[in-house]
Amino acid sequence: MARYTGPKARINRRLGTMLYETAGAARAMDRRPQPPGMHTRGRRPSNYGAALMEKQKIKHYYGLGERQLRRYFENVGRKSGNTGELLLLMCERRLDNVVRRVGFTKTRPQARQGITHGHFRVNGVKVTKPGYMLRAGDLIEVRGRENLKNLYRGVIANSPPDGLDWVSFDSETLRATVLSLPGAVDISLPVDANSVVEFLSR
């Protein structure tokens, strides 16, 4: 997929939330929270425009392309339950999301880079796909090279992780264990998923 490489702060401001977590993007959002560009009197977006913005939030936050998002949508559409909630829960199970949320990295792009460079193993096997779907019982660990371990120890020391209810994390051994699948309370992105479902169903 074509990964967004432009100004992160611009996306945060346009969509009105902190989707990219770099220090520069955070400072820019604090200074100028309004959308980029010339500002006239604000107009309420149409239902289509509002749903499009919610879809864009999911794509940028989790690092998904359009086709990948639609594949996820088709997958959860075959299951029983709230489709919007199931879509977000599938995104939460991505390896790059969990690597970020347990505290191995400060941002999801950093997590994706580490995974594609082969820094992590799942159940003892090197995984290089950021979108790898984790299951209950999976063990994530940094590969045995000491320079890699020191790299991630430094990140953790500077930004202690908050912790997740569904994933245990040992900062000493650099291991994370998926205790269970995430639930609705574990979704980290505030978004109107139902409007996204309606948008993707068109």
UniProtKB/Swiss-Prot annotation:
The keyword Chaperone does not apply. Keywords: Ribonucleoprotein, Ribosomal protein, RNA-binding, rRNA-binding. Residues 93-155 form the S4 RNA-binding domain. Signal peptide: none annotated. It comes from the Bacteria. InterPro entries: Ribosomal_uS4, Ribosomal_uS4_bac-type, Ribosomal_uS4_N, S4_RNA-bd, S4_RNA-bd_sf. One of its GO terms (cellular component) is small ribosomal subunit. One of its GO terms (biological process) is ribosomal small subunit biogenesis. One of its GO terms (molecular function) is rRNA binding. Pfam families: Ribosomal_S4 (PF00163), S4 (PF01479). PROSITE patterns: S4. Belongs to the universal ribosomal protein uS4 family. One of the primary rRNA binding proteins, it binds directly to 16S rRNA where it nucleates assembly of the body of the 30S subunit. With S5 and S12 plays an important role in translational accuracy. Part of the 30S ribosomal subunit. Contacts protein S5. The interaction surface between S4 and S5 is involved in control of translational fidelity. NCBIfam families: PRK05327.1 (NF003717), rpsD_bact (TIGR01017). This is Small ribosomal subunit protein uS4. The gene is rpsD.
